[in-house]
From Swiss-Prot:
<keyword id="KW-0694">RNA-binding</keyword>
<keyword id="KW-0687">Ribonucleoprotein</keyword>
<dbReference type="InterPro" id="IPR023574">
    <property type="entry name" value="Ribosomal_uL4_dom_sf"/>
</dbReference>
<feature type="region of interest" description="Disordered">
    <location>
        <begin position="39"/>
        <end position="72"/>
    </location>
</feature>
<dbReference type="GO" id="GO:1990904">
    <property type="term" value="C:ribonucleoprotein complex"/>
</dbReference>
<comment type="function">
    <text>One of the primary rRNA binding proteins, this protein initially binds near the 5'-end of the 23S rRNA. It is important during the early stages of 50S assembly. It makes multiple contacts with different domains of the 23S rRNA in the assembled 50S subunit and ribosome.</text>
</comment>
<dbReference type="GO" id="GO:0019843">
    <property type="term" value="F:rRNA binding"/>
</dbReference>
<comment type="similarity">
    <text>Belongs to the universal ribosomal protein uL4 family.</text>
</comment>
<comment type="function">
    <text>Forms part of the polypeptide exit tunnel.</text>
</comment>
<dbReference type="GO" id="GO:0006412">
    <property type="term" value="P:translation"/>
</dbReference>
<protein>
    <recommendedName>
        <fullName>Large ribosomal subunit protein uL4</fullName>
    </recommendedName>
</protein>
<comment type="subunit">
    <text>Part of the 50S ribosomal subunit.</text>
</comment>
<keyword id="KW-0689">Ribosomal protein</keyword>
<dbReference type="Pfam" id="PF00573">
    <property type="entry name" value="Ribosomal_L4"/>
</dbReference>
<dbReference type="GO" id="GO:0005840">
    <property type="term" value="C:ribosome"/>
</dbReference>
<keyword id="KW-0699">rRNA-binding</keyword>
<dbReference type="GO" id="GO:0003735">
    <property type="term" value="F:structural constituent of ribosome"/>
</dbReference>
Length: 201
């Protein structure tokens, strides 16, 4: 397979095993769902009546006071009492093996390639850390919502992109399915393509 490099106007060979696979929707859905679930904190917790601090003594006698009967100050119907079905901390980790994860990334890259959402460049940098310079460069390329994958990330590029919520810069080793499907276009440097091919083969 070959793609045209935007800045040098030369054709770049890319692996068909990574950028020319059939789109496996069910696998991508499974991996994306697993990735999102794993990111959940699961730290929400409440106290049940057995965990609330308080006396175990009956507040008043059963009969003769005129008030409703009560057996504990820790009852869920009392103020400051325990919660009936108290939430507990949970581990939301959902395991996906490496082969499935790699195949999902290959499938996503292939679909992006088919939809002409991948742009190849020799290098991508800005002269200063000013956001307006990066925005101007992207406007010249007719880009707004973009993921930039580069082998060597320029400090100016990182600093200038931080203020743009629709622009994300990352190393090839840090790519994940959420990033790949979240942006309309993906800019990849030639050096980064080689690393991606090494990682996914």
């Amino acid at each position: 397979m070959e793609l045209l490099c935007i800045d040098s106007k030369e054709k770049v060979k890319i692996s068909e095993k990574i950028f020319g696979q059939k789109f496996n929707e069910s696998l991508v859905h499974q991996v994306v769902r697993s990735y999102r679930i794993t990111k959940r904190q699961g730290t929400s917790a409440q106290k049940s009546r057995s965990e609330v601090i308080g006396s175990g003594k009956k507040p008043w006698r059963q009969k003769g006071t005129g008030r409703a009967r009560a057996g504990s100050v820790k009852s869920p119907i009392w103020r400051s009492g325990g919660v009936t079905f108290a939430k507990k901390t949970r581990d939301f980790k959902h395991k996906i093996n490496k082969k499935m994860y790699k195949n999902a990334l290959k499938s996503i890259f292939s679909e992006l390639c088919r939809q002409n959402r991948i742009l190849i460049v020799k290098n991508f940098f800005v002269k200063s850390e000013k956001t307006k310079l990066l925005k101007k460069k992207l406007n010249e390329m007719n880009l707004e919502n973009v993921l930039i994958i580069s082998k060597t990330i320029d400090k100016n590029l990182v600093l200038s992109s931080r203020n743009l919520n629709k622009v994300h810069v990352c190393f090839p080793i840090n790519i994940n399915p959420i990033n790949l499907i979240s942006f309309k276009k993906t800019i990849i440097t030639i050096d980064a393509i080689k690393i991606i091919e090494e990682i996914l083969t």
